[in-house]
Regions:
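Hydrophobic helical membrane-anchoring modules
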Residues: 1-46, 190, 214-282
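Short, acidic, metal-binding catalytic loop of nucleotide-sugar glycosyltransferases
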Residues: 66-76
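Short, structured coil segments at secondary-structure junctions
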Residues: 96-98, 232
Length: 282
């Protein structure tokens, strides 16, 4: 049976702390790992891995994959798409594009899908990981810019900034939210970031290995990654990039108010967790 037929969208229980949810979560990850091994039994990534978590993006992801570089300098670039459940043909589009594909049988959330990707990156030879969205808002051809601070040894973690670059969207409320939450996050982690919610990021694999056990957010995880990395002393910088409108379809992150409340929740919960953890280590 084809992968897109086997893996249909299911809804897990709402109570994230429920034992049944945790068990289904583990089974879903085990299923995805098995799926990856069946598709790619001898997988070996290039030094640079472009990692995309995708949920029902069959209309958009093909254009992103078409523009993906295969070499940056003398470094080979591999691409891994983690399909986060869904009932469309995202997995088939990725497979047809010839990239590494891993399919979750249920929708766990972007954060959970990316954590799975981080694990696969470490296990299959990647030295640098670049995350970007499946909807066309991040330009894959800007990946050399995102890797530059890692390659020259000046940073461990790079975040793209639409405020330092160009924002081609017209949502003034979302733009104001970007500035507000960057200000809040900077106050917490003593950074000078301008676009902390941007999903276009690059990492040294050593950083991901260090912070991965401390990441718990299944969705709206971008703030959690910044706070966790900063609290553990990793060097963070930013690079100017172009932020494009979605290629097609509505955002999967919800409306501005919902997104803002969820993002604030993640900032607060992560800050409290990191603060308590630091006190206990003392």
């Amino acid at each position: 049976m084809a992968p897109t037929q086997r893996h249909r969208w299911l809804t897990l229980p709402e109570n994230r702390g429920h034992r049944r949810y945790r068990e289904l979560h583990r089974l879903a990850l085990d299923s995805a790992r098995s799926d990856f091994e069946q598709r790619h039994p001898h997988a070996r990534f290039g030094p640079v891995l472009a990692l995309i978590a995708a949920y029902e993006e069959e209309r958009n992801i093909g254009g992103v994959l078409k523009d993906m570089p295969t070499l940056i300098g003398d470094l080979e670039v591999s691409t891994l798409v983690v399909v986060d459940g869904g009932g469309d043909n995202t997995a088939q589009v990725a497979t047809d594009a010839g990239v590494f594909t891993c399919v979750l049988p249920v929708n766990l959330g972007q954060g959970a899908a990316l954590r799975l990707g981080y694990e696969l990156a470490a296990e299959h030879g990647a030295r640098f990981v670049v995350t970007l969205d499946a909807d066309g808002q991040n330009d894959p051809t800007e990946m050399p810019t995102m890797l530059e601070p890692l390659l020259d040894g000046t940073a461990d973690f790079v975040i793209a900034s639409r405020r330092l670059g160009v924002d081609r969207t017209t949502d003034r409320f979302r733009q104001a939210g970007v500035q507000l939450y960057a200000w809040i996050l900077n106050a917490i982690v003593s950074q000078r970031l301008t676009d902390s919610s941007n999903g276009y990021r690059s990492f040294r694999i050593e950083l991901l290995d260090d912070i991965r056990p401390h990441l718990v957010q299944d969705q709206y995880q971008t703030a959690e990654v910044v706070i966790t990395a900063a609290s553990r002393g990793w060097r963070i910088t930013q690079q100017p990039t172009v932020w494009h409108p979605r290629a097609s379809g509505p955002s999967k992150k919800g409306g501005n108010l919902f997104f803002g409340l969820q993002y604030a929740r993640v900032i607060l919960s992560t800050w409290l967790r990191v603060t308590v953890g630091n006190r206990r280590r003392r």
